[in-house]
């Protein structure tokens, strides 16, 4: 894309990031985990460990989505190393990066900080100062691996969301039996369950649109219009410092409400390569999957989860692949 051509709409990127190895964060988190069960403590630990992936997330955005205006990094009093590195970048790239503290977006609700809950943090993203109406939300394990255009994310300003329709769990006999025999499983805040829960809040009674773990195109106005402005309702959502099954996914809730209002474009073809448990399948399989998708032009997004669990030798190979893929001259 010619950098001199002004896009029809401004699009920002938002990345939520935590340095799980930070001693102050570990201490702070430990104070709130004292009453938590050991199983949940382990779950929280792996969710927030990181191996420097955010460098490749940011560089992939700059390289493969040059239309992006600002790149907001939302974090808890931390700053990734790439911010220091960016001091040597050309101004046009350096000025894209903006670190936003949780206190800024939580505004009058800072009493619920610190929070270690991405579901809670996501609910407040629309409160980022100067955030564009159109933005794409990234987790720090989501990467772009091929060139993209605004039209891959928005059509005439309307978000384009890929996924597939699924029956609500309560409508499937297997889950009905499971919840009857093992009622405690209802209290697990799983990826699919939370999306189904979000759809039900939006009024869906039979099915929900299951989306993938990929960068998410969103409208700021959808958050303001579709997430309750009632203070009590918002507090009920953001009061949990760790994930809770009672919470909805804010992006899924606004998407389902947008579906009701015909202000969302759905597509069922997948443009994502998603790799789960790389520590289980081994680096050879991971690299094979990555290389295999090089020739698939429809796949432009990548998600690799739990890289912190990969052994150091395999991790270096995977990170080297990401480094090569996202290499760009920024100086």
Q: Which stretches of residues belong to each language-model region?
A:
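A conserved acidic beta->alpha catalytic loop
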Residues: 21-23, 76-82
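Active-site-proximal specificity loops/subdomain of glycosyltransferases
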Residues: 45, 49, 79-131
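Long, charge-rich alpha-helical interaction segments
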Residues: 160-241, 245
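Short, acidic, metal-binding catalytic loop of nucleotide-sugar glycosyltransferases
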Residues: 60-68
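GT-A fold catalytic core of metal-dependent nucleotide-sugar glycosyltransferases
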Residues: 79, 124-168
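Short amphipathic alpha-helices and their capping/turn segments at secondary-structure boundaries
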Residues: 1-16, 124-131
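Long, low-complexity C-terminal extensions of enzymes
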Residues: 10, 245, 249-331
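A solvent-exposed, charged loop/short amphipathic helix patch at secondary-structure junctions
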Residues: 10-12, 20-47, 163
């Amino acid at each position: 894309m010619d950098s001199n051509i002004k896009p029809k709409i401004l699009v920002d990127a938002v990345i939520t990031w935590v340095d799980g190895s930070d001693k102050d964060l570990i201490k702070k988190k430990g104070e709130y985990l004292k009453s938590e069960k050991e199983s949940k403590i382990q779950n929280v630990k792996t969710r927030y460990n990181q191996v420097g992936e955010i460098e490749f997330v940011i560089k992939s955005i700059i390289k493969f989505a040059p239309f992006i205006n600002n790149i907001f990094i939302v974090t808890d009093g931390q700053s990734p190393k790439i911010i220091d590195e960016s001091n040597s970048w050309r101004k046009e790239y350096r000025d894209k990066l903006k670190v936003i503290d949780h206190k800024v977006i939580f505004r009058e609700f800072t009493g619920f900080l610190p929070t270690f809950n991405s579901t809670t943090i996501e609910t407040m993203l629309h409160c980022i100062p100067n955030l564009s109406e159109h933005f794409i939300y990234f987790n720090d394990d989501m990467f772009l691996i091929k060139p993209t255009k605004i039209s891959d994310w928005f059509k005439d300003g309307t978000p384009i969301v890929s996924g597939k329709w699924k029956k609500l769990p309560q409508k499937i006999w297997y889950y009905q039996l499971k919840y009857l025999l093992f009622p405690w499983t209802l209290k697990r805040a799983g990826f699919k369950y939370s999306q189904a829960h979000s759809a039900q809040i939006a009024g869906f009674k039979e099915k929900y649109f299951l989306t993938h773990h990929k960068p998410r195109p969103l409208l700021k106005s959808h958050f303001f219009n579709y997430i309750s402005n009632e203070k009590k309702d918002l507090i009920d959502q953001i009061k949990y410092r760790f994930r809770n099954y009672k919470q909805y996914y804010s992006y899924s809730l606004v998407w389902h409400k947008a579906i009701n209002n015909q202000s969302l474009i759905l597509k069922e073809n997948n443009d994502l390569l998603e790799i789960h448990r790389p520590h289980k399948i081994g680096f050879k399989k991971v690299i094979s999957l990555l290389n295999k998708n090089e020739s698939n032009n429809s796949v432009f997004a990548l998600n690799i989860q739990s890289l912190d669990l990969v052994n150091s030798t395999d991790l270096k190979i995977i990170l080297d692949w990401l480094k090569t893929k996202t290499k760009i001259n920024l100086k």
